[in-house]
Amino acid sequence: MFDWNEFKILAEKLKDEKDEASQRTSISRLYYAVYWKARLILEREDPNLRVPEYNAHKFVWDKFSGKNKTRNAISRKGRDLRRNRNDADYEADIRKPKELVNDSFQIAEHILFYLNQIQPK
């Protein structure tokens, strides 16, 4: 099975590059590393969980909502990181790509911290 954390490692390598393509790719790979960690936790918690193909990302982040403060934070910040990833992947003009990279890494670190708190041992 693929180790999704390898995307985070790649994102960290790309984040300090000067070209916008590397910065955008960094955000995208970071997002997928965090998304898959979150999704796999949900799937471990509930082996019968079926993530739909359509709107899978919304489903995953929404699934954390409403349970407790930690899970609500994961849900909220997951949606924030997804918004940044969508901007990086789909917007032709990003005014300050380096700020978007920094913001994305800050959000991701919060999510990963919270995910580590709830991750089944």
Regions found by a protein language model. Name each.
Residues M1-K121:
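Terminal alpha-helical segments
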